[in-house]
From Swiss-Prot:
Task performed by this protein: This cephalomyotropic peptide stimulates contractile activity of cockroach protodeum (hindgut).
Residue list for modification Pyrrolidone carboxylic acid: 1
Lineage top rank: taxon: Eukaryota
Positions of post-translational Glycine amide modification: 8
Species of the source: Rhyparobia maderae (Madeira cockroach)
Major subcellular site: secreted
GO cellular component: extracellular region
Keyword set includes Secreted: yes
Protein name in the entry: Leucokinin-6
Length: 8
């Protein structure tokens, strides 16, 4: 299980 978050 993996989670990815990106803020620009």
């Amino acid at each position: 299980q993996s989670s990815f978050h990106s803020w620009g």
